């Protein structure tokens, strides 16, 4: 029967078929041709397998090892290749080669993701989205490892494993547990700002193309004269912001759980390349020292009025991965991967991630993960004293000396890439930061950014989640949101009361139904026992 051409993701196999003039010869992993891959080697047609069936053993042994550890966060994602092009000059702030000339293009790969879900989870969950960019620059790979929100839930990395545990499954029931999540949120009021964004309209983006990205952290830019400023990175979508209503997101989770991945793939295959603008905010060291709050606190944003956005360039995604596992799954990002001209700030969360991200890549992919094609700095080959280890994929740096310094033409230092000097002082202690202002910016979000309908949807979304929690957790959450604004707390209390009443009614109806079933159950059991008894009498003959 004649068929119309399907969507791009439906035509992948047909595209591959058309790209080949003839099939390859089927081989084992060591490249030997295979005579028959449709039957195992056995003694007779019904006999046992032979241990010398190396074709089967080769296939099965590799299959047993196909899966690698999934990311502990950001497990589910999609991505694509593209380029970054400089459109505006920022060399007065930054000497990085990637920004050196207007019109300069740098290859990139972006991986988008959800945060808390597993590899098979739905793309349309209410969850922050990862927005990680790898720039393959001529001075090494630069990873801008961001999210789709300008802030984060916590400001001290000591809480990160605990926070993520609340987003994962209960260790006993293996179910998502709202009590865990809201217990943590309500005990740590610094989460309030991000929680309001998460449960607002932007908590469920309409795919990956219609959301912004943010470096979130404060970084440091250094120019060729050694002068430094603090910086925040913004990636603004040119497609316009679009979000999904909760009911649509829930429907898609069942009908099209890979909605965002499919949308990105089909868009690029159709030539509808998504575009973003890379922008920065800049703050001087003097401004940072005298600012009204800690500018390195990732739970807060910098005022756009005081620190306006500066355009840097555009980002375009124009090529889908040739293999999902090799590229999207094996790509490894780390905020510690920076290039000359881009440095770190005292941001505590950033400092914590400098260790955590490379460490988790070592766990997932091994010590030589940077040698994988998707991760290697192919425009600036690595020369160092690191050798050997599992999966040393390239030439292992040949005969170059494995120590430094040396007298035998080994790799040498480059004197013009010295990091900027900066001063720190203070007592060594564990500063808990509980006295930070956790509610002023959430109040601005409530009063100045959200309109009346957005505030109403925020309240309903929070109530819909909180209704599953213990009463004392609900009360503590209401208290936090009341500190944002009295109207917020009052509205949430009213919405939660209605949600609780509806929940109680539903549970009473379920209990009544279960009680009726339990009354009928003994009769059914008696009937089955009589049948078994009669069957036993029959079988004895």
From Swiss-Prot:
The keyword Metal-binding applies. It holds the Pfam family Catalase. InterPro entries: Catalase, Catalase_3, Catalase_AS, Catalase_clade1/3, Catalase_core, Catalase_haem_BS, Catalase_immune_responsive, Catalase_sf. It catalyses: 2 H2O2 = O2 + 2 H2O. Keywords: Heme, Hydrogen peroxide, Iron, Metal-binding, Oxidoreductase, Peroxidase, Peroxisome. Its cofactor is heme. Residues 1-20 are annotated as: Disordered. GO terms for biological process: hydrogen peroxide catabolic process; response to hydrogen peroxide. Heme binds at residue 357. One of its GO terms (molecular function) is heme binding. Its main location: other. SUPFAM superfamilies: Heme-dependent catalase-like. GO terms for cellular component: mitochondrion; peroxisomal matrix. It is an enzyme of class 1 (oxidoreductase). Its EC number is 1.11.1.6. The active site is at 74, 147. SMART domains: Catalase. It is found in: Peroxisome matrix. Belongs to the catalase family. Catalyzes the degradation of hydrogen peroxide (H(2)O(2)) generated by peroxisomal oxidases to water and oxygen, thereby protecting cells from the toxic effects of hydrogen peroxide. This is Catalase. It comes from Ascaris suum.
């Amino acid at each position: 029967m004649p068929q119309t051409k399907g969507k791009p993701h439906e035509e992948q196999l047909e595209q591959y078929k058309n790209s080949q003039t003839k099939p390859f010869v089927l081989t084992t992993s060591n490249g030997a041709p295979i005579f028959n891959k449709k039957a195992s080697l056995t003694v007779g047609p019904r006999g046992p397998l032979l241990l010398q069936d190396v074709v089967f053993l080769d296939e099965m042994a590799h299959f047993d090892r196909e899966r690698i550890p999934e990311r502990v966060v950001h497990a589910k994602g999609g991505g694509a290749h593209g380029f970054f092009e400089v459109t505006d000059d920022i060399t007065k702030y930054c000497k990085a080669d990637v920004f050196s000339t207007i019109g300069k293009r740098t290859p990139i790969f972006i991986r988008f993701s959800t945060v808390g879900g597993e590899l098979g989870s739905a793309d349309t969950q209410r969850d922050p989205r990862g927005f990680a960019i790898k720039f393959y620059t001529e001075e090494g790979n630069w990873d801008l490892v961001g999210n789709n929100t300008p802030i984060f839930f916590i400001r001290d990395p000591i809480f990160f494993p605990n926070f993520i545990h609340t987003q994962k499954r209960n260790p006993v029931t293996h179910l998502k547990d709202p009590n865990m999540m809201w217990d943590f949120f309500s005990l740590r009021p610094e989460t309030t700002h991000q929680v309001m964004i998460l449960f607002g309209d932007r908590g469920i983006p309409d795919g990956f193309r219609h959301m912004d990205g943010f470096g979130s952290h404060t970084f440091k830019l250094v120019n060729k004269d050694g002068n430094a400023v603090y910086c925040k990175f913004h990636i603004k979508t040119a497609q316009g912001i679009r979000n999904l209503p909760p009911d649509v997101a829930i429907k898609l989770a069942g009908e099209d759980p890979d909605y965002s991945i499919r949308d990105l793939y089909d868009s690029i295959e159709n030539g509808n390349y998504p575009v973003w603008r890379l922008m920065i905010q800049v703050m001087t060291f003097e401004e940072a020292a005298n600012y009204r709050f800690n500018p390195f606190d990732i739970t807060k944003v910098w005022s756009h009025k005081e620190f306006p956005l500066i355009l840097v360039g555009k980002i375009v995604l124009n090529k889908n991965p040739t293999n999902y596992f090799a590229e999207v799954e094996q790509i490894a990002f780390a905020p510690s991967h920076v290039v000359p001209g881009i440095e770190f700030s005292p941001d505590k969360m950033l400092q914590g991630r400098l260790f955590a991200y490379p460490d988790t890549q070592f766990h997932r992919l091994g010590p030589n993960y940077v040698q994988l094609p998707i991760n290697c700095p192919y425009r600036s080959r690595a020369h160092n004293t690191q050798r050997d280890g599992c999966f040393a994929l390239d030439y292992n740096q040949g005969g170059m000396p494995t120590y430094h310094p040396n007298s035998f033409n080994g790799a040498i230092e480059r004197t013009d890439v010295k990091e900027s000097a900066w001063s720190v002082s203070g007592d060594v202690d564990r500063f808990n930061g509980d006295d930070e202002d956790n509610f002023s910016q959430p109040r601005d979000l409530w009063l100045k950014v959200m309109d009346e309908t957005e505030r109403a949807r925020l309240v309903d979304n929070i109530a819909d989640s909180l209704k599953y929690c213990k009463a004392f957790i609900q009360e503590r959450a209401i208290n936090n949101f009341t500190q944002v604004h009295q109207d917020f707390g009052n509205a949430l209390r009213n919405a939660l009361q209605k949600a609780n009443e509806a929940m109680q009614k539903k549970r009473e109806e379920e209990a009544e139904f279960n009680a009726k079933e339990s009354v009928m159950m003994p009769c059914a059991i008696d009937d089955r026992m009589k049948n078994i008894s009669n069957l036993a009498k029959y079988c004895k003959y």
